[in-house]
């Protein structure tokens, strides 16, 4: 028997105003496509939005090690915010959806990299060669 797939949570700073950009559109489209296969939701972490859950609220409600926390796979992607997001999500399943490179941070061992292109995959292959790369 196969284990059920984890639900996915895509972290974005917000979905309106100054956060509208290509990276946001990619995350929204990826979440929409994957929602046809597994439960998927966008989660904001800077701008509270009425229709979306907020990261700080979820972290309080679902402490590491709880059944709810273990059932989710968090997807982080927002360049300069990735190190802070990884610290906040320590102890939880997380993957990095890498749109580009050169942000100057190192990934902790074991964090999978989901690269959107060959150049990004090559960059992370050089700088995070022991992490799972896709």
Task: Report residues per predicted region.
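A generic structural motif
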Residues: 35-42
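Extreme N-terminal starter segment of soluble prokaryotic enzymes
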Residues: 5-8
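A short, glycine/small-residue-rich beta-strand->loop->alpha-helix junction that serves as a flexible
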Residues: 14-26
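Extended catalytic core of nucleotide-activated donor transferases of GT-like folds
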Residues: 1, 12, 28, 32, ...
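Extended, folded domain segments that form the structural surfaces/walls around functional sites
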Residues: 10-11, 41
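Short beta-strand->alpha-helix junction loop in the catalytic core
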Residues: 119-120, 132-134
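A structural preference for short, hydrophobic beta-strand core positions in alpha/beta folds
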Residues: 42-44, 134
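Short intrinsically disordered, low-complexity coil segments enriched in acidic
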Residues: 1-3, 133-134
